[in-house]
Design a protein with these regions (language model features):
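Short, charge-patterned binding micro-sites
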Residues: 13-24
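C-terminal cap of thioredoxin/glutaredoxin-like
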Residues: 1-7, 11, 30-33, 70, ...
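Conserved active-site segments centered on acidic
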Residues: 52
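Dinucleotide-binding Rossmann-like beta1-alpha1 core, especially the glycine-rich loop
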Residues: 30, 56-63
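Conserved N-terminal beta-strand and adjoining loop/helix that marks the start
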Residues: 64-68
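Short, structured active-site "lid" loops
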Residues: 26-48
Length: 176
């Protein structure tokens, strides 16, 4: 989208399951999941958005990966880190709560992994993440991904055309 429009993307943290223990939990298959495929409607939404999504084996505690994402955003490479984390979780089945996985992602996108790991160990971004989460709850957000384009808010995986339509409406002044 940023190639087609003069826009910037800013990530905000949302703890989907804030009660998940730090070590994560083994994910139980949901009704309708089979042969490495997600259940509906998520399977169709992912397909329409040209996304690869396989059921992961672990539901991670996402606080540390969200903190790492905040670090990446402050380094100016939010999208690169976000894409690497997405691929690690949904395509490769890696545990995003695992510090070794996070360190590998940081190295993959050329972040200073030593500095990042120090910040994760010291909970440097925890307050920022919790403030963003509380703000999202205040807006009534209860799921991910959620997108805000102007005054338009929508949740879930969507085809590219949905985003271009929303951006076009905002740019045309139809921002309600």
């Amino acid at each position: 989208l940023s190639r087609d429009y003069d826009i910037s993307v800013q990530g905000q943290a949302y703890l989907l399951r804030p009660d998940t223990p730090r070590e994560g939990i083994i994910r139980q298959p949901r009704p309708g999941e089979a042969d490495g495929q997600l259940s509906e409607p998520l399977r169709s939404q992912a397909s329409e958005a040209n996304l690869i999504m396989r059921p992961p084996g672990v539901t991670p505690n996402t606080l540390r990966i969200l903190e790492a994402t905040e670090y990446a955003q402050r380094q100016g490479i939010f999208m690169e880190f976000h894409h690497a984390a997405y691929q690690a979780y949904w395509e490769d089945g890696l545990d995003l709560g695992d510090l070794a996985v996070i360190e590998g992602l940081a190295q993959q996108v050329s972040l200073n992994s030593t500095e990042l790991m120090e910040r994760l160990e010291s909970s440097f971004y925890t307050n920022t993440i919790m403030e963003q989460y509380q703000q999202a709850l205040g807006y009534g957000i209860r799921g991910i991904p959620t997108f805000v384009v102007g005054n338009l808010l929508f949740t879930g995986a969507h085809p590219y055309e949905i985003f271009t339509s929303a951006i076009s409406k905002v740019l045309a002044g139809e921002n309600s």
